[in-house]
């Protein structure tokens, strides 16, 4: 059988969540508002599949450069290459 090369392959530990979080999906995460220029951390919530970035970007920090519907455009550096990701607010956390 061939090896799987799916979207979430090789992410068993990266996307694992704690056994019993206090609230599975707090509504406050979904209604977060970010301004253009804010620095945000990309923290993938594996229980929400819409607007989820690729697991390779989990833990990266980027800058909000715009909005596309309910999602945000986040500019990051992947090595030397600049990339723009479309991510919903459930997977973002404001840098303090």
Swiss-Prot record:
GO molecular function, one term: structural constituent of ribosome
Keyword Ribonucleoprotein in record: yes
Superkingdom of this protein's organism: Archaea
Keywords on record: Ribonucleoprotein, Ribosomal protein
One BP term from GO: translation
Disordered as annotated region, ranges: 1-22
GO terms under cellular component: ribonucleoprotein complex; ribosome
InterPro entries (UniProt xref): Ribosomal_eL21 (IPR001147), Ribosomal_eL21_arc (IPR022856), Ribosomal_eL21_sf (IPR036948), Translation_prot_SH3-like_sf (IPR008991)
Similarity comment: Belongs to the eukaryotic ribosomal protein eL21 family.
Protein name in the entry: Large ribosomal subunit protein eL21
Species per Swiss-Prot/TrEMBL record: Methanosphaera stadtmanae (strain ATCC 43021 / DSM 3091 / JCM 11832 / MCB-3)
């Amino acid at each position: 059988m061939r090896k799987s090369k799916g979207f979430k392959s090789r992410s068993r530990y990266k996307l694992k969540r704690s056994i019993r979080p206090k609230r599975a999906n707090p509504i406050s995460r979904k209604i977060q508002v970010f301004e253009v220029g804010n620095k945000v951390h990309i923290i993938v919530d594996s229980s929400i599949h819409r607007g989820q970035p690729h697991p390779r970007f989990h833990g990266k920090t980027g800058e909000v450069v715009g909005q596309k519907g309910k999602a945000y455009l986040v500019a990051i550096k992947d090595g030397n290459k600049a990339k723009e990701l479309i991510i919903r607010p459930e997977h973002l956390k404001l840098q303090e």
